[in-house]
């Protein structure tokens, strides 16, 4: 049950767990706003109602409302305002899940009388409770749909026109941008502080209602050569876990033109959406200069790193056990004379840089691990030999290593980052925070791109 939007309430709840570490094969996604659009479609996917759907009076409406019953249960069994939570009130991430339906609620209430809403939190105030109950009794009327602000409308037109320019160079650029910004909360310069947009692929052109094309991954085929990049006003409440802000402005568009459109290179054909190509950014976007791609990532390295820290992959201790409680991150200088900054080296290594998402979503750990371990070892050994055989000698490389570290061009605060682990979550902040950590990451272009395609895009 997703309570961050009205559409989540009307969709209802499902007993199928989104995160299930024992599942060995993929299941159809059920992303709100994407994988179904109507209540009937969600019911066909196994979601049951939490609001009344066939009531004719306020009394019947409340009686049929699972949401009301859960709120009422809390009123009947108020939570103490002081002291520790009882052992029966489990708040751990991996707790046993209970997802009752309206038909099963009486049994649920008998077995778990203290599990009303809000779960494990103090009771709502009388005013809050009364407001919600009155709204539910009225049939939970639909709130006014948000609309783009006046300050955003002109920018929306310009940005959608930019993203859908017809040249092959622009089409390749827009695909690259989309695959890196698809989970961003886009904020336009000069618009209200809580007005955000998502970049989506739509079957409808600018000026028409958006019909998002639902694919599992952003590099999956849109199903047609005729599709459009659109900016969709995000209607849900903002929550810290998934809130990754990325700003669009005139300066940003000028920077995109500087990086991707003004350099002298040719795009002779667009890359295939076949998974062997699309899942490997070093093949799909090889026509775009490496410097342009890497500079784009470095411009907002905080956002790129935050993509996997705040994305759906980073959840729970299993995901977080691989990182230290606090560590620093720096990046290889895009102007340094190292192989990872050169097209020839990346073309040579592209087969060794492919990612497991090429193999699909069904778990085959041993076979995949062996294959990619061999590829990774080959790449690491080749990269090491290439570094040592470059113009600088090994002695200078180790003695003067800091000259290979990006300094943010003297002004970019993304040059140094600190990552904190908080038990089963994490966060990113700019700069070196705290004393010297036990470890630090030095990330070059291939590693930064692979982190994104392994843990975010793929």
Language model features with spans:
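Aromatic- and Gly/Pro-enriched helix-to-coil junctions and flexible linker segments
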Residues: 1-458
